[in-house]
Curated annotation (Swiss-Prot):
Stored InterPro entries: Ribosomal_uL6-like, Ribosomal_uL6-like_a/b-dom_sf, Ribosomal_uL6_a/b-dom, Ribosomal_uL6_bac-type, Ribosomal_uL6_CS
Name of the protein: Large ribosomal subunit protein uL6
Keyword line: Ribonucleoprotein, Ribosomal protein, RNA-binding, rRNA-binding
Entries under PROSITE patterns matching the protein: RIBOSOMAL_L6_1
Domain of life, source organism: Bacteria
Pfam families, A to Z: Ribosomal_L6
UniProt keyword Transport, yes or no: no
Membership in a protein family: Belongs to the universal ribosomal protein uL6 family.
UniProt-recorded Gene Ontology molecular function terms: rRNA binding; structural constituent of ribosome
Record NCBIfam families: L6_bact
GO CC, one annotated term: ribonucleoprotein complex
Subunit structure: Part of the 50S ribosomal subunit.
Function: This protein binds to the 23S rRNA, and is important in its secondary structure. It is located near the subunit interface in the base of the L7/L12 stalk, and near the tRNA binding site of the peptidyltransferase center.
Amino acid sequence: MSRVGKLPITIPEGIKIGLNDLEVKISGPKGELSKTFKGNIAISLAENKLLVKPLAANKNARAMWGTARSIISNMVTGVKEGFKLKLEINGVGYRAMVKGKYLNLMLAKSHNTKIEIPSDIKIEVPKQNIIILEGTDKEKLGQFASIIIKQRPPEPYKGKGIKFENQFIPRKEGKKN
C-alpha cells in the first residue's frame, strides 16, 4: 500500500478541477495545467478532496498510484502559489543576462551560450551570478534548470560552474607534488 498515494489531496479555495477520464485539468490564480495519466489508476473528486486509487494490484499500478498523486499535488501547488528555483553561477567572468526571450550565458567558452526561455517560465537575473526561475509546472521548471546547469556543471576542484542555491558540491584536493 502506497503511503503517498493513499493521502487525499485537499483542494484550496479558488482552484477549479476538471476530470475527464484520466485527464486532469487544474486552473487557479497563477495559470492552468493539464496532465493525462496512463491506465491502472482511477481519479475521483469528493467534497474538495481529490483521491487517486489503483485499479489493479500489480507492481506497475502501485508505483503509478503514488507518482500520480504527487504529480497532481504539485499541479495544485503550482497553480496556487507557483514554484521558484534559484541558481548560482560561480567562476571568474561567468555571467548571465536576459535578452528578449533568450537567456545569455557567458561561461568561459569561445562563444556565449543562448538558451531560449519557454513561454511558461519567468526568468529574473537580479545579479550577474544569480538566476531565479519561476513557473507553475514543477517538472518543466526542473527540466529547464537542468538544461542551464548542463552548460557548465559544477566541478569539484575549484567549485566553478552553475548549481542550485543550496546545493553542496563535494570538494576534492588537487595534485600533490
